[in-house]
Amino acid sequence: MGHHHHHHGGSGHHHHHHHHGSGHYGGGAVLVTPIVTPVPVVYGSRSSSYCPKSMTVAYVLWFFFGILGFHRLYLGRVGTFFLYFFTAGVFGLGWLFDAFYTHKMVKHYNECEFTKSCVGQSPPATIPIYQSEGAYPTYQQVPQQPPQFYQPQQQQPQYQP
């Protein structure tokens, strides 16, 4: 029992010291708490932000690609198409008619209708559709429309089979 009393006394003395330490530690713990809190928050936010970020990036990329890249791609496509068309025309039968018609068409439509036809036929119909349906109606709905269209389209085939 005497031993217990001694332990208690020691504990009491220690408790006082511990209390002081605890108070000091508490400050550290409080400081650590906010630091630890942002970690999971950032993690969660990162995971949640990953989706919208990807959406925004895709939208920005699409926008830039649609304005700058599309023009460049369309120019290159037209050049390739023109070269191929010209070569094929030379080998074909109505080269003169084709050449004249193409020249007149290009000059008349200022490479607008011809390009549209070429772009619509050469690459997938996704770019022209997105360009027409996405860019014209609303700029803000462009980033929200692709994911919405992608999700239902991906879910539909999964649900059907």
From Swiss-Prot:
Its chief place of residence is membrane
Record keyword Coiled coil present: no
User: Transmembrane residues, as ranges?
Assistant: 25-45, 55-75, 81-101
Note the topology in the membrane: Multi-pass membrane protein
Q: Where is this protein found?
A: Membrane
Q: Which residues form the TM2 domain?
A: 52-100
Q: Which residues lie on this side of the membrane: Cytoplasmic?
A: 1-24, 76-80
**Which InterPro entries does the UniProt record give?**
TM2, TM2D1-3-like
The record's similarity note reads: Belongs to the TM2 family.
Protein name as catalogued: TM2 domain-containing protein DDB_G0278163
From what organism does this protein derive?
Dictyostelium discoideum
